[in-house]
Amino acid sequence: MHPHTSQVKPSCLMVVIPRHKERTMKALVYTQPNEMQILDRPHPILADGEVVLKIESVGICGSDMHAFHGHDPRRKPGLVLGHEFAGTIAESGTPLFAPGQRVTGNPLITCGYCEYCLQGRNNLCANRTMVGMTRPGAFAEYMSIPARSLIAVPDNLSMDAAALTEPAATALHAINLSMRALQRPIQECRVLILGGGAIGMLAALLLKHYGVDDLTVAEVNPLRRKAIELHASCKTFNPIEEKSPENSYEFVMDCVGAVVTRNTAMAAIKPGGVIMHVGLQDWSSEIDMRKLTLAEITLLGTYTYSTVDLQATVSLLARKAFGDLSWVEKRSLDEGPQAFMDLHAGKTAAAKVLLKPF
């Protein structure tokens, strides 16, 4: 080394790469039993074959209430619930749908290749997952979902009405199964619906559309009874105060699914009649097997809907088959925690509350 030169040690320079701020969105989160909170959550990341929806309207389902009460071990605290949705495509990872399109869809994400999917009975897919259960749901500003689960919303259908597709399809599927089992046209049947929640109300409206005149709904909430009488133009009664007549109905829909309603259904059904078990509040059974056997009662179960049912329901909603839907209540997403509390306390006449994130 030259005597007049000095060794210069190289310096270690740290290059700081600026970190992009994570995109967040507002969501209604199930935080613990009987508690919902508005919190920031990560914005969905677009994946191949999926879309990111801007949620325009989302309904509170009875199963969301069940989770809210801490009665569904599959839906754990920290989850964004909500599966009755309508929205606009914000980002698309598929050529099937483009940003800006209005859609609703099937919250059941099915495999497409099992025996039930191939039969068109994809509601029974053994490999199914579900929005608002195994992946974040629609109580949020945005949600990701596979594009194959989506159904286009026609221009003459509002997004609030489109958000009723899922529960209305549940009613349609149950009624379709029942009509196959009935021994006479449903228009000629005397019909009893147990429970005047969203499924009971939608079933009553659809049965009226089908021409059923002799229709009665049993509901304990006086506000809901009044709404059902007004919008479905049918008879109602309080089953706590008034007993349903025995052996009187050709068709009974149990939209509650509790021990007491199962017993009521079995007592009310006529020989040769059909009981459709829709609700599942509990599953302990005290069915009168003697009457079931000797009176040739048909007892049916139902689970959600098929893709065909959802598509048919969108068409029915667009044709106003469920009426003007003025009984539906709309609130902002920020009002979601209070909406859950009001539904829990029976303080709203609305059988369906829709939350609006924007």
Indicate where each model-derived feature is located:
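Residues in the short beta-alpha loop(s) of Rossmann-like NAD(P)-binding domains
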Residues: V220-N221, Q281, Y305
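Glycine-rich beta-strand-centered segment in the early N-terminal region that forms part
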Residues: E35, P44-V58, H71-E115, P154-N156
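Short, Lys/Arg-enriched N-terminal segments with co-localized hydrophobic residues
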Residues: P10-T24
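C-terminal hydrophobic helical "lid"/dimerization subdomain
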Residues: N263, T307, Q311-F358
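NAD(P)H dinucleotide-binding glycine-rich loop of Rossmann-like/cofactor-binding domains
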Residues: C111-L194
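Detector for the Zn2+-coordinating histidines of canonical Cys2His2
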Residues: H4
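Glycine-rich cofactor phosphate-binding loops and adjacent beta1-alpha1 units
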Residues: A181-Q187, L192, Y210, R225-T298
